[in-house]
Amino acid sequence: RSLVARQSKVAASSLHVLFADSQQIKQFHDRRDAFQSQQGRVLLSPLERAHLRTRTIYRWSAAVVMALVCFAAIAVMYWPVFRSIFSGGSLYSDVLLPTGASFTQLVQSATTPWVFGSGTGIPAPPTPWLLVLMLASLVTLGHVTAALAMILFVAAPLSALSFWALAGVFTRSDVVRVLGGLLWASTGIMFGWYAQANMPMLTVMVFLPAAFAFVFRAVGMYHTEDPLKPRTSVQAAAIAALCFIPVVAAEPQLLFALIVVFLMFLLFVRRKRAMLLLIPVPAAFAVAPTLVNAVRYADLGMWRQLFGDITVPTSSANGSPASLSLLEAAQRALGWRMGSTDYADLAVTVLFGVITLLALASLVLPFALRTSRLMWVVIVCGGALALVSSRVAITVDADGVVAGSAQPGIAMMILGFLACVCLVAGGAVKRFQPLHASGSDPASKKDRLHVLIVSGRVVLALILVCCIGIQCMYGIERHKDAGLGVSENGLPMVTTDYLEAGADHRVLAVSAETRNIVNYAVMRTSRGDLIDSSPAQRVEVAFGRSDDANKAIAKDCAQLLSNADSDAVADLSELGFGGIYVVRSGEDKAQKEITDQLSSNISASDGTQNVVSTDAGTYYRLTIQDTAKQHIDRKGYRQAESSVWRQAWLWCMGIVLAAYCLVALPRMRRHGQEEA
């Protein structure tokens, strides 16, 4: 009480040291934030900067040489095709249709829920990979055929660089990174994707490793050059999201596996988990029409279109739906016979065995426990996807029901295996040693351990070189003739002029296979067009659903094959066709007789006029109606084009892509140096 009684009162004006105004508080917060941000940075000395600059030069020099080697290898392997692409022709193969479409037609097909591949057109979601082709065509200034050729020959160097970036997440060894990139690029040769011009799988090869590389960089799980430290990056997350768009657009079935992978990443990643949830958003918007159609008409089996792509599926390549084991699915996808005594099959068996053992070894490495388990999640999800896809029917052909391709899932598995192989190499960070410390430490156990580690990396590099040779040998041996070529032919010039005169002009191309079988295609360009290839339309065929126009065309073609029929010609004219082009196929005498019979029947029918005849075929103009009235009904297309849902999708996708692109733009950094 006595102390309290003796207290005195002091005016606040005399205690100004204990008070802070708003400006002082703001200054304190700014300095505190600056201090906290500097704690995660490394201040580099001039010698350290010189060390990093030297490492950057070595690293990128090796990457450029690797890319040039890949480009030269593909150009040499397919030199006749590479030489012919400059003539203006279109690529084609056993699985890839040629194209004669303009850039405007490509944009319309890529953004409008209407497919002209069946009859005179049906409502169906656009094939997502056309968005990738549309962007590639911008690089070639609107030349669609040049864009296809560019994708084929640029895919190898870009896929090598893509995996080189992913390998840099796990190891800084330049040799292992370069050999890993070459091994990933040679995987496309082994599967025959270059020989087939399999555009969807080449797209996956280019973008899938890069997408995962930026995912790891986004959450700060990557190795850097000494003395830098890894850090999280929103910019890397945005780039990863953009890289996943072409992957999902090329092979929508990968979406199922990627969803599971991202859910598992949320469990293993320590920080920035919310950022991971935003990575799949742009890809989901890009394939939104396909997803909505698959869910809305799931009871009609339209979900099966997710297991198809823009290539033409065949029973010989995909097989029939069956409950296969993982080894059987891999053998079907690769054309590999595990129990065979053929040297190529034996070499691939040894290759897969060695890669699997190295991937299993990565699970017990103490410095890569979390990362190795993440990549094994990718392996397991890819294998599960391959098993599911081989059980799903997506269309029918002359040999029966065709199953979905197991190749996307197997490719995802191989990506995980090769990533685990890079993990085995260790960090391999070249430590920076100041000049005064060089040579000051005597030899120790640590130095001897370093020699053993380097020797192990040399052995690993030799194994990777052997694997590259095996994959290239197998691909060249097994995929000698996949029908890859450049189509410089097409419809006659007079026919092409008629088609180009109006977007609603059509010509029916027919080819007699036997006396009882006739093939037909509705032509709106000079070639049977790639942009009209639709997985959704093929699912409709698999379930026996066909529009009235398609049924009428099939009936009329069958009647003209059997005999002259003026009513059939009148029906085709009524549907809007301006002519019939009879294709001469094969040099066989019996085949020529069948083709001549079909041509004679068309000539003998009323309302036809022989306009031009070449070695490739004969064009007949339909003269029943006036030229101005010869056009298909585009009412359904105009409704789909003006649909509110289409406009909403395009606007939403554009806004989302613009936002992610702004975040992904490179920024100038004052401190530090991010390492590729």
Residue ranges and their predicted role:
Residues R1, Q7, D33-P80, A659-A676:
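Start-transfer (signal-anchor) and selected internal transmembrane alpha helices
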Residues Q7, S440-D441, K445-D447, I468-A676:
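Extracytoplasmic
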Residues A62-C70, L278-T290, D447-E477:
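Internal/C-terminal transmembrane anchor helices
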Residues L68-T120, L277-L326, R506-A512, N516-T525:
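Aromatic-rich transmembrane-lumenal/periplasmic boundary elements in polytopic membrane proteins
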Residues Q108-W114, I279-A368, G490, Q625-E641, ...:
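Periplasmic/ER-lumenal interhelical loops and adjacent helix-loop junctions
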Residues P157-A165, V169, V175-R270, L276-L291, ...:
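Membrane-embedded helix bundles of polyisoprenyl
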